[in-house]
Amino acid sequence: MCGGSIYDVRRGIITVLSKGLLLKKYSNSRIVIQNQGGRYELKGKKAYIWLLARSGFTSRGIEEQRIFSELCKEGVLGQTDMPNSYGMYCLLTSNILCVNRRKGLRFPLRGLEKKIMQWLQDGKRKLTVEELIFLIENDVNPLIYEDDMFGVALSERIYQTRVHVNNALRREMVGAKYRDITVNAILRLLEKNRLYLM
């Protein structure tokens, strides 16, 4: 199961991911973010680390890890002591993926990033990271379910042979062939500010 120490900096390497939506970037040392209805202004090293952590950031430094702990307590950073793709999978599955619908200059997406955004933007229901991995692993086209008004057919497709209890799909997708490439595509979308975590 996913896990890891949250505040124990004596264990060594810590990996973090930013939570919340970047609203305004004045500089690398002053930003305004929104998370769960609240607005936060981060300054100095806190702002710098939050920006670095948008697509994952790993550190051994005691000073950085102290800042990690402070940002975690504020609810704007998630962290794990597993600095690998499994750790990133655990961080992503313990949060909600949200689409950044703010206007601005956006470059077109290709390949897997485009497919993930189609699922998340056009879907009739919210999808978890493990559900996205399942859909990509099974090469399910987002357009097939366009007329599925409430996402019932999609849910049946995902959970057709599974009991939807105790994170069964999350545990199953830990060993999925497409887990790492899907996680990496999601991290790129986070870095491009197309997605954010809650």
Residue ranges with predicted function:
Residues 3-54:
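Short, amphipathic alpha-helical interface elements at domain boundaries
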Residues 38-198:
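Long, charge-rich, low-complexity alpha-helical segments
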